[in-house]
Design a protein with these regions (language model features):
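Helical hinge/lid and interdomain linker segments adjacent to catalytic or ligand-binding clefts
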Residues: 78-165
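Alpha-helical protein-protein interaction elements
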Residues: 18, 36, 47, 122-123, ...
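A glycine-rich, often tryptophan-bearing local segment used as a flexible ligand/cofactor-contacting loop or short
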Residues: 129-223
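Aromatic-Pro/Gly-enriched surface loop or interdomain linker
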Residues: 1-115
Length: 223
């Protein structure tokens, strides 16, 4: 769920007429962050001086955290991503009569492995990309204690984030030094202001995703 906040109000540069036509044809959620910049954009966008946005909060209207929102306007896919894609997993579990609970990243961060210890299996969402040391510790401890960790997503466990000690709803991301990234942190800005820790990729922090789930994101084509 940290991914929902980090991508919150992502204004994509390719929001074109074809996208709007698809929204109308599918009767999808009609509003898009590109049209409502006064609510604040995502950490995949830029400030007016072209510096990358490194802070995000879910305590504001988030256009792309709504059922039926289409993330991608072109191509032959569903156009769904993150929350909307995850909702299909919930619907499938309900249709199959499989009981489940939802555990948020915040619960993992605050309660650690205790929040998931009593479960036999844990399945991630479709895009578990952003993590704190505490959430990774919880998942690793769950796995090492015999839990079945099912990773069916993509680009998981990639970026390190920090939460504000004064307001845990605030998330910070520093896109430093390497990796596929929307913008690059400037020299001297690789460390989080919230906790002083080195940011960037988990791989550069000694915890590549392969250590946790055996596979990890390396590169991408046109996106």
């Amino acid at each position: 769920t940290f991914t929902y906040t980090v991508y919150g109000n992502h204004a994509r540069p390719d929001f074109k007429d074809r996208w709007r036509e698809r929204i109308q044809d599918w009767n999808a959620y009609p509003h898009n962050p590109a049209d409502f910049r006064h609510y604040g954009l995502s950490t995949y966008n830029f400030h007016s001086d072209n510096s990358g946005i490194c802070y995000a909060s879910a305590q504001r209207p988030l256009m792309n955290l709504r059922p039926g929102y289409i993330t991608f306007g072109e191509g032959n896919g569903s156009g769904l991503r993150h929350y909307q894609a995850d909702s299909h997993l919930y619907a499938w579990l309900e249709a199959k009569g499989i009981d489940f609970d939802l555990i948020t990243d915040r619960e993992l961060h605050e309660e650690g492995v205790d929040s998931i210890r009593d479960y036999k299996a844990l399945c991630t969402g479709s895009h578990p990309e952003y993590h704190t040391p505490q959430t990774l510790d919880a998942l690793q401890n769950f796995r090492d204690q015999g839990g079945r960790l099912v990773y069916l997503g993509g680009n998981g466990f990639y970026w390190k984030i920090a939460l504000s000690p004064e307001d845990p709803e605030l998330i910070e991301i520093r896109r430093g030094e390497s990796g596929i990234r929307a913008w690059a942190a400037e020299p001297g800005e690789y460390y989080h202001s919230f906790d002083g820790s080195y940011g960037g990729l988990w791989r550069r922090n000694g915890r590549p995703p392969q250590l946790l789930v055996g596979v990890g994101f390396s590169a991408q084509g046109k996106f």
